Amino acid sequence: MESIVYILLVVTSVIGLTFIVERGLVLRWRKIVPPEIEAAVESCQTPEDVPMLKRVCQQHNSSPLSRLLLLAADRLTWPKAENVDALQTRARHEIVRLERGLVVLEIIVGIAPLLGLVGTIVGMMTAFGDVGQASQIDAAKLAQGIALILRATLIGLLIAIPSLIFWSYYTKKVEMLAVEMETLCDEFIRRQYREPPPKTPPPLPRAS
């Protein structure tokens, strides 16, 4: 039973490390919000600038921000409210994709210490069972056995603590990325649906 617990702890640590590295590569700020797209959004002041923005977004089509801006740019003929609704629906989908894997880290945070505790309890039951069957108690051997058993709890905590740190960090980073993408998309939409300034009538000729 103890060996099964240790195997589960090793598997848990491998899964946790895999998702920590994978999310670290995916959630790079430059990959999600490329500076080139930020600059293009700043430069896109009028409908005539939209083709330039679309070209830049197509060059970075792996970015969630580029996909959102392309969606909004392709629907500029729609009413503003409908375009915003479509954009918000797609944004929720993109955020879910960014959060993929974080739930696994959250599960590992909860399950790793419990697996360690199970290993400790099973080991303690075995150790004290052997003591009960033995005619003489070897204190040194018992202490050594208990120390070995407690390693399961230590391993579980060593797996859970880094997972908790990275889960908290990645969760906060996704929130920050979502706010930045929302800000840039809102800025783009606001500019494209901005009412043109009223034309100033020509000055009346002065009476001679």
Ranges and model annotations:
Residues 4, 10-11, 94, 98, ...:
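Generic hydrophobic alpha-helical membrane-segment signal
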Residues 13, 20, 120, 124-127, ...:
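Hydrophobic/aromatic residues in alpha-helical transmembrane segments
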Residues 30-118, 122-136, 168-208:
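Predominantly long cytosolic amphipathic alpha-helical stalk/bundle segments
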Residues 1, 136-138:
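Short, strongly hydrophobic alpha-helical membrane anchors
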Residues 20, 25, 94-97, 148, ...:
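Short alpha-helical segments used as structural interaction elements across diverse proteins
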Residues 6, 140-167, 171:
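Pore-lining and gate-forming transmembrane alpha-helices of multi-pass membrane transport proteins
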Residues 1-38:
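Hydrophobic membrane-targeting segments
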Residues 8-21, 108-118, 159:
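Lipid-exposed faces of alpha-helical membrane segments in multi-pass integral membrane proteins
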